[in-house]
Amino acid sequence: MYMTAREQKLLKHLLLQNRYITVTELAELMQVSTRTIHRELKSIKPLMETVGLTLDKQPGKGLKAVGSPEGKQKLLTDLSYEQHEYSADERKLLILCSLLESQEPVKLYTLAHDLQVTNATVSYDLDELEKWISPFGLTLIRKRGFGIQLIGPENAKRKIVGNLIVNRLDIQMFLEAVELNIKGKTDSSEKMFGVVSKGELLKMERILFQLKEKIAFSLSDSSYIALVVHLTYAIERIKLGETITMEQNELEELMNAKEYSSALEIAGELERAFGVTIPEAEVGYITIHLRSANRKYKTEYKAQEIELETALQTKRLIAFISDKIRMDLTKNYSLYEGLIAHLEPAVSRIKENIEIYNPMKEQIKRDYFLLYMAIEEGVEKYFPGMSFSDDEIAFIVLHFGSALEIKKEEAKVKALVVCSSGIGSSKMLASRLKKELPEIESFDMSSLIELKGKDVQAYDMIVSTVPIPYENIDYIMVSPLLNEEDANQVKQYIKRKIPLILNKKRSSKEEAQQADVPDMLEAAESIGRYMEVIQDVLRHFTLAQLKTNPDHSMLLLELFQQLKKDGLIRDPEKAAVCLAEREKQGGLGIPGTNMALYHLKNDEIVLPFFKMFDLSTPYEVDGMDGNTLRMTRILVMMAPGSLSAEGSEILSAISSAIIESGESMAGFQEEGGQELYQRLNRIFFTWMKEKNIL
C-alpha cells in the first residue's frame, strides 16, 4: 500500500490513541486545515477496513479507531515496514543532523540512499539548507569527490541545535523515553532528536532532576527539556575537544547575572558525572540558556531584579495595545506580571539569537488575528532593534488574550476582493491572500459593477486589483499575484484599521440567531445554477490553434471571431474593444509562464465558458506583476454580464486552480486538450466535495 507521509502520521496517531480526538486537534497536530483532515480520513478508512477497524464518530467527542488489538497491531506493523516518505523539512533536518554528527565529509549518495530520494533531490535540499544555516554563521562545503561538510564556529553549531532541532522536539516523546528508561526498556545507543544519544540524554535528565532543589528557579517543561538536550549535546562536543569561546567582557557580565550561581552548580555536577573539565566559557553558555528559559511561575520575577528598560517597554506596550483596541489594560497588574515573566527571558533569547517554538502559533494567529497584528506592531515600536519571531509574538498574544474580553468572533476579518470582472484576477488574489494571511476568515468576490450594489460596510477590508472609481470606499490596491511588498502593505493596512474594525464589531451587537432549516426550493435552485455553469464549461471547453499575425489588436479580433463561430459571443468587435479596455487596467499575463488569462464579463457573451488557444505567433504582453512575458497560450474565461453568483463561484474556482501550485501552472501551460479536460473535471469534483454538494 502507498501512503503519503501525512496519511501515515495521521493513521499512526489514531491507532495509538485510546481516547476520542477531534478533527480540530488532528488539524493542529498535522498543521493543516480541518478540510484536509477530512480528506485524509477518507483515504485511510479503506486501509483500516482491511484489518477490521472502523472510525467511530461521536458528536462533541470526536473520532476513535475501533477494533481488535490484533487489527491495530497488524496495521502498525505494516506502517513500520512502509517506505517512509519524508517531507522536505524533515529531509533538511535529517541532513543537518547527519552533518552535525559527522566529523568527516558526508557523501551525497549516502544521504540520498538514507533518505530514499535521488541525488538531485538532496542537492536541492542542500541549497535550501544553506539558506537555513546562513544566519547562524555556518556554511556548507560541497565538492565533487570530497562530499559535504558543515563549517563554522562551535558556538553557531550549538545554537542551531536549539533553534532548528530542539524547537521541534516532541515533549510527549521525551517523557515516554524517560518512562521507558525507568522501566529499563530503552536502547541507550539510539539517537534522540537526531543528535544526542538517548543513554546520555537520560543520564543528563536524572542529574538535572536531582539538582532541581539547588537551582534557584523552576523552568517550564519545554525549557527544562531544551536545557537537557543542550547540555547533553555540549558534553558530547566537549568530549570531542570542541568547546565554545566567549569574549571576556561578555563572560564578566554573565558572572553578575542571578543565574550564574545555578550554572556553576550544574557545571560542577556535570564534571563529576561525565568525567570532563568544563571551561568558564561553557559555564557562561549554561548561564545564557538559563536566562533565556521560560519560568514556570511568574512570581519568580521580583520587581527589584527586573531590568528597568524591560519594565518600561512592557508598560508602554500595554498602553499601546490598550489604545489600539480601545480597552484600558494599564491597571491590570496581573497582565503586567505575566508579560514581564515572559518578556525578560524573551529579550535574552532574542539578543542571543535563540529561538522558541510555539506549537499553537497558527491557531493563535487564526483565533486572535487582529490582536496578533496589533502586538506585532507594538513590539516593533517599543522594542526597537529586536526581531520578535511569530512564535514569540503568539506567546505574548496569549497573555493579552487571557486579560481581554476580545472574543474570537471579534478577531475574525471578512474581506471583499474586487477585480474588473469578478471572475478572474479577484479569485487569484483571494487564493494568494489565503496563503499569505490564512487568518482572514472569509473572502467575497466582486466586479466593479457589482460593487455598486454591495453593502461595503459589511466588510472589514476591501482589496482590489484595479482602481475603484467610486467615492467614499476605503480600499487597498495590489497585484493579483500578491508579491511580498503587496502582502506587507495589506498587513500594514489591517494594523491601521484595527480600532475601526473592533469598534464596528462591538457596536453591531446582533444576537446570534438559531440556524433555521433552509428553504429547500431556493437551495435546489442554487445547486441547479452551479450545475448549469459546470455543464456549460465542460461542454464548450477546447484547446485549439489560433493563427495570428504580429498585430496585437488583430489578435483580439481574430480570437472573438473564432468565438462567434462557436456561438459563444454576439458582436466580436464590441467584445474585443471591451477586453482591450480591460487590458489597459492591468496586465493579464501570468508571471513565470507563457500564458495569459483573458477574462471578461459582458452582455456580448452568450454563456459562461472556458477555452484555451495555442498561438502560431508568440506575443509580448504585460504580466499581472507589471513585467512583460512572451505569450504562446491564451486562457479565455468569459461570461454574460448577468452571470449568477453561483456561476461566478464556478469560474473563480478555475482561475484559483490555475495558480494553486507550480504543478498546476505547469499543467495548464503544457498539457493537451484531453488532459486539460480531465484537469477541469477534477477541479469541479474537488470543489463540489468541499461544498458538500456531492
Curated annotation (Swiss-Prot):
Q: Which positions bear Phosphocysteine?
A: C419
UniProt KW Lyase keyword: no
Q: Which residues carry this modification: Phosphohistidine?
A: H230, H289, H342, H399, H599
Which SUPFAM superfamilies does the record match to this protein? Phoshotransferase/anion transport protein (SSF55804), PTS system IIB component-like (SSF52794), PTS-regulatory domain, PRD (SSF63520), Winged helix' DNA-binding domain (SSF46785)
GO function term, MF aspect, one = kinase activity
**One Pfam family from the record:** PTS_IIB
Q: Where is each PRD domain found?
A: 195-300, 305-410
GO BP annotations of the record are: phosphoenolpyruvate-dependent sugar phosphotransferase system; regulation of DNA-templated transcription
Its Enzyme Commission number(s) read 2.7.1.197
Boundaries of every PTS EIIB type-2 domain copy:
413-502
The keyword Transferase is assigned to this record:
yes
What does the record note as the disruption phenotype of the gene behind this chain?
A: Cells lacking this gene cannot grow on either mannitol or glucitol as sole carbon source.
CDD domains reported for this sequence: PTS_IIB_bgl_like (cd05568)
This protein's UniProt keywords: Activator, DNA-binding, Kinase, Phosphoprotein, Repeat, Transcription, Transcription regulation, Transferase
Reactions catalysed according to its record: D-mannitol(out) + N(pros)-phospho-L-histidyl-[protein] = D-mannitol 1-phosphate(in) + L-histidyl-[protein]
In UniProt terms, what function does this protein have? Positively regulates the expression of the mtlAFD operon involved in the uptake and catabolism of mannitol.
Entry's family note: Belongs to the transcriptional antiterminator BglG family.
What is the protein's name according to its record? Transcriptional regulator MtlR
Give the organism, scientific name. Answer: Bacillus subtilis (strain 168)
